[in-house]
UniProtKB/Swiss-Prot annotation:
Family: Belongs to the PqqA family.
Paired cysteines (S-S): none
UniProt keyword annotations, A-Z: PQQ biosynthesis
Gene from which the chain derives: pqqA
NCBIfam families: PQQ_syn_pqqA
Protein name as it appears in the record: Coenzyme PQQ synthesis protein A
BP GO annotations: pyrroloquinoline quinone biosynthetic process
Species: Pseudomonas fluorescens (strain SBW25)
Recorded metabolic or biological pathway in which this protein acts: Cofactor biosynthesis; pyrroloquinoline quinone biosynthesis
Function: Required for coenzyme pyrroloquinoline quinone (PQQ) biosynthesis. PQQ is probably formed by cross-linking a specific glutamate to a specific tyrosine residue and excising these residues from the peptide.
Pfam families listed in its UniProt record: PqqA
Cross-link (Pyrroloquinoline quinone (Glu-Tyr)): E16-Y20
InterPro entries attached to this UniProt entry: PQQ_synth_PqqA
Coiled-coil ranges per UniProt: none
Length: 24
């Protein structure tokens, strides 16, 4: 799901990082 909203993009990046650390 690729959204064109900058705010959502930033939020998604933060979520990706959170999931990344959660997976470790």
């Amino acid at each position: 799901m690729t959204w064109s909203k900058p705010a959502y993009t930033d939020l998604r990046i933060g979520f990706e990082v959170t999931m990344y650390f959660a997976s470790r």
